[in-house]
Amino acid sequence: PYEKIGAELVKEVAKKTDDVAGDGTTTATVLAQALVREGLRNVAAGANPLGLKRGIEKAVEKITETLLKSAKEVETKDQIAATAGISAGDQTIGDLIAEAMDKVGNEGVITVEESNTFGL
């Protein structure tokens, strides 16, 4: 029964990550799996489940705070190109994304579709 609960939890983490961020589902799944595994191991060894939950919540709060402090706004076309290039693993794609974002502006929408035509 615990395995099913853990699997459902990991599935929910991946879905929520995809819904909110659109990326990072693999990382979220690996982290969730480790949390479930270690949590169950600690409970089996006698740890208080509520204490573990509170500890995890405090850790999430601190990590979120630290990430937000170190986050940087991406505003210029060059910054967008660099960030998108890293994310895509290809600077040419990063440049195309930056160009598209420059054309549509902050409130614009960019739709990406699969194509059989190379380079478009």
UniProtKB/Swiss-Prot annotation:
Species the sequence originates in: Mycolicibacterium rhodesiae
An example Gene Ontology CC term for this record: cytoplasm
Gene Ontology terms: biological process: protein refolding
Protein's UniProt name: Chaperonin GroEL
GO MF term list: ATP binding; ATP-dependent protein folding chaperone; isomerase activity
Enzyme Commission number(s) from the entry: 5.6.1.7
Catalyzed reactions: ATP + H2O + a folded polypeptide = ADP + phosphate + an unfolded polypeptide
Enzyme type, top EC level: isomerase
Domain of life: Bacteria
Subunit structure as annotated in this protein's UniProt entry: Forms a cylinder of 14 subunits composed of two heptameric rings stacked back-to-back. Interacts with the co-chaperonin GroES.
Protein's job: Together with its co-chaperonin GroES, plays an essential role in assisting protein folding. The GroEL-GroES system forms a nano-cage that allows encapsulation of the non-native substrate proteins and provides a physical environment optimized to promote and accelerate protein folding.
